[in-house]
Amino acid sequence: MSLIHKGATLALFLALTMVVNGVFGRFIVEKSSVTILNPLAMRSKHDAAIANFGVPNYGGYMIGSVVYAGQGAYGCDSFDKTFKPKFPRPTILIIDRGECYFALKVWNGQQSGVAAVLVADNVDEPLITMDSPEESKEADDFIEKLNIPSALIDFSFANTLKQALKKGEEVVLKIDWSESLPHPDERVEYELWTNTNDECGARCDEQMNFVKNFKGHAQILEKGGYSLFTPHYITWFCPKDYVSSNQCKSQCINQGRYCAPDPEQDFGDGYDGKDIVFENLRQLCVHKVAKENNRSWVWWDYVTDFHIRCSMKEKKYSKECAERVVESLGLPLDKIKKCIGDPDANVENEVLKAEQALQVGQGDRGDVTILPTLIVNNAQYRGKLERNAVLKAICSGFKERTEPGICLSGDIETNECLEANGGCWEDKKSNVTACKDTFRGRVCECPVVNGVQYKGDGYTSCEPYGPARCSINQGGCWSETKKGLTFSACSNLETSGCRCPPGFKGDGLKCEDIDECKEQSACQCDGCNCKNKWGGFECKCSGNRLYMKEQDTCIERSGSRIGWFPTFVILAAVASICVGGYVFYKYRLRSYMDSEIMAIMSQYMPLESQNTTDPMTGESQHQQLRLTSAA
């Protein structure tokens, strides 16, 4: 980064700091009361400044015995002993101010087993609020684990308690939070000042976790008419001399009127401050429009869904992603856009203008200078932003005996999937939903139904996956039955996707019958007559011919008998030749044998020289022999 750029950045930072310090100068210290019950001679009531960490016992009180950590024991290190009083009461530990963070003192006190910690001021001054330390790895290890109440007491009161303990007196105190928050009527009004930046580390994570965890409580209170919740977002404005600078342009909308710090504190990388302001404005408009539609509690759904689906960490923090969340929750997008207006216009935005005015405290209400800040009945909440701790504070804001049931029961459950399916995907036809109700709210997660896993984002899509997917609503694919015939675009041979069956065309989600006759894709042979049918076609040939579908041709049905005649003639000719050959063979064989016999006999019977005549017949012997052999 160049020196010029560094200088401009520093100048802008200082200018913004002066603006903030000039506007936000009045911080209200929220208090509890501390009463000395024993010794009776010391009975009196004092104020204590509630710490902005731990868990104040709003609406209640604590009576305990006091112990002192000791001179020079600042509680900056773990105590090597536990503090046990003489009587079976909770222990209230006094620790001197100084040397380390307030929260670390209270943490070490909590580790030693005490029920509450009072930090004794070492300066004679008005009470101040003990705040959490700056974000650091060391502080983050214990700050969220603080579960006990703590407060700062003034220098004079602390010395009074120490002197009594030094004399061996048993000191019993009552710390009372019952009047720490106003409780005028049967409805509690509370506000949460936050922002949409999810890249600011543990503090941003704390805010988002609170919204997710408190959503169930908040929606029950809002739907029942027990509370009136309003979200708020801190913005600054750019000094007039810097409006045209690149820094102001990257951090502000509406010509420098509404600004937020760069989330990465790097003007050349990642998201800009104006992206934060723009989403802050959208979330304000979501609440405004939802409230006009008597659905103000939907703000909690939008914020949690936006964080899940459109986070900066996943590089999805965008207008397009936000609008998809709006539509999934059934909110009128056009009205929200109208509420947002044009962020580039050189005009005031009425919504953000009102936010800047509310940041400045009026009357008994202090300025909003810390994020997050929770305000209950116009008084700032002190303590960690945790579901049960905040619920207890809100419940303490009801007029006595008007508390709703949620304040009287430790268990709470609401089925958020019953309304608009929780903004999740659902298939009404097969009664399958991605909405799962949990104690902390609902989640959108594709289900497993009858052994079939659905896959998708759970918000806009879930599709059955695997070999058995067609058993559930045909895998989400097209399917239709006509005249006893059923066709489907789902195939169990494929683990996903839809494909129209033969005879149909489309994307698988919708399929239409193909008119093979009209498209001339079949039955185009000579003499063929084509008739379209649902899922196929019928082709008939003229005359006595038969249609062959694979070859798209017709053949003669009588052709089989005509074809056999030549074969028969040939076979008959072959048979005749065989018979004739056999007869000729027999004749030739006999003639050959006769000649052979005659030749043999002629050697032994000279027939010509002995040509005698038989007296009985008148024939010669030679003639008789020939007749005999020929017989």
UniProtKB/Swiss-Prot annotation:
Residues 585-631 are cytoplasmic. The gene is VSR6. Residues 610-631 are annotated as: Disordered. GO terms for molecular function: calcium ion binding. Belongs to the VSR (BP-80) family. Keywords: Calcium, Cytoplasmic vesicle, Disulfide bond, EGF-like domain, Glycoprotein, Golgi apparatus, Membrane, Protein transport, Repeat, Signal, Transmembrane, Transmembrane helix, Transport. Disulfide bonds join C417-C435, C424-C444, C446-C462, C498-C511, C530-C539. This is Vacuolar-sorting receptor 6. It is a single-pass type I membrane protein.
